[in-house]
Amino acid sequence: MKIEYLHASKYGNGAMVAREFSRQMADKGVTVDVRHIREARPKELPAADLYLFSSPARFGKPIRGMRRFLKKVELPAGTRYAILTTEAAAHPDTAGHVPSDKEMAKWTRVRPAMNEILQGKGLVEVAEGTVHVTEIKGPPEEGWQHKVETFAASIPIQD
């Protein structure tokens, strides 16, 4: 199985997650080609069994470069994809209140925005996940490798 992993890492967190995902999938005999979206042409993506798109969040949405990239992607309808994002972890407000997952979901729309673009092209999602970062520039939260491992386990492997 071959996975094409396209990320838009700004501060290196997404690239770190991509390397960990690639390592874990290699242990399962899966080939993962990792590249930054600046190194890829959205209308000329190499053939793969699965495309994995990864974006950091900016104001609760995928960064603009990833949104533009996804809008230009040309893949046949029915193509399988997955999403793995890097997003800010919940932090207490000035009153000390830490938002719940439900509250966070109201303003964090990275995966839904990416899905809307890709599903609008007839692509089929097979998995999605998030790795939280402690600050805007990172690093990832403690235990992030386990989150990547859990995500990798959710990818249906084809021979």
Language model: regions and residue ranges:
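N-terminal beta1-alpha1 ligand-phosphate binding loop
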Residues: 2-28
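FMN-binding flavodoxin-like domain, especially the glycine-rich phosphate-binding loop
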Residues: 16, 24-28, 33, 47-159
